[in-house]
């Protein structure tokens, strides 16, 4: 029997990706990013303050928050605010987004400012954290470009681009950019964050069904490099538009 994916995509094919800039009115940067049916609103907000541990050091800070709308999935989930605390998954993902974006910022060039990336999942169909990172980078770029245009900073603080994609082993085959049916039924699931210099910022990989081999890991990383390369092209095209 020949291998096929539920979506009909080839093993190395991304879902259709759209990056819509200036999606909301008030934020210094805002992007609606779509990976197939996964849609995440990413906004960048600039504040002229830094956390206490950075006061007086002349450095800026980049951080992130992540959340899912109650009906972003098949069944409604209570808002975390109604529960009184954020869940472990939410905290893990927003820390990942913050780490990924700080990896592309010269915080000295930013000055004593904080840029907060709010990533709100409007609709989830797998890969929300990787979509959030990819879209949040573009929102961040718009925010720092505005700071430069206003003369608030003198030097561009971005030292590269960042994007992320999921890969996994689905029915024995390495595949790129898992959607929900694949993610919920895969043997291995991995999230890969990279910069546009070819460097890896973070790898998150877990065997769900059976342990993966070194050759399978190599195949997954090769797929991720291909996919992230395509995402960098889409980011550049969006920022040039």
From Swiss-Prot:
Superkingdom of the source species: Bacteria
tRNA processing among keywords: yes
Gene Ontology terms describing biological process: rRNA catabolic process; rRNA processing; tRNA processing
Family matches, as InterPro entries: ExoRNase_PH_dom1, ExoRNase_PH_dom2, ExoRNase_PH_dom2_sf, PNPase/RNase_PH_dom_sf, Ribosomal_Su5_D2-typ_SF, RNase_PH, RNase_PH_bac-type, RNase_PH_CS
Binding site for phosphate: 89, 127-129
Class in the EC hierarchy, top level: transferase
Entries under PANTHER family matching the protein: EXOSOME COMPLEX COMPONENT, EXOSOME COMPLEX COMPONENT RRP41
Protein known as: Ribonuclease PH
Species annotation: Xanthomonas campestris pv. campestris (strain ATCC 33913 / DSM 3586 / NCPPB 528 / LMG 568 / P 25)
Organism ancestry: Bacteria, Pseudomonadati, Pseudomonadota, Gammaproteobacteria, Lysobacterales
Gene this chain is encoded by: rph
């Amino acid at each position: 029997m020949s291998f096929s994916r539920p979506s009909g995509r080839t093993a190395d094919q991304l879902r259709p990706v759209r990056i819509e800039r200036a999606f909301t009115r008030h934020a210094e940067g805002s992007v609606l990013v779509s990976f197939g049916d996964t849609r995440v609103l990413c906004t960048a907000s600039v504040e002229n303050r830094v956390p206490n541990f950075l006061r007086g050091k002349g450095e800026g800070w980049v951080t992130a928050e992540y959340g899912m709308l109650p009906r972003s999935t098949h069944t409604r989930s209570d808002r975390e605010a109604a529960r009184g605390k954020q869940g472990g998954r939410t905290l893990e993902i927003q820390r990942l987004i913050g780490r990924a974006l700080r990896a592309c910022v010269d915080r000295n060039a930013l000055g004593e400012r904080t840029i907060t990336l709010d990533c709100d999942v409007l609709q989830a169909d797998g890969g929300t954290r990787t979509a959030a990172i990819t879209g949040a980078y573009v929102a961040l770029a718009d925010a720092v470009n505005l700071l430069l245009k206003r003369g608030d900073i003198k030097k561009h603080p971005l030292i590269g681009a960042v994007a992320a994609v999921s890969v996994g082993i689905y029915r024995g085959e390495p595949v790129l950019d898992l959607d929900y049916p694949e993610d919920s039924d895969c043997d291995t699931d991995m999230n890969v964050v990279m910069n546009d210099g070819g460097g890896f910022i973070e790898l998150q990989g877990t065997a769900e069904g059976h342990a993966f081999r070194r050759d399978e890991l190599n195949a997954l990383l090769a797929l991720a490099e291909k996919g992230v390369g395509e995402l960098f092209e889409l980011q550049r095209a969006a920022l040039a538009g």
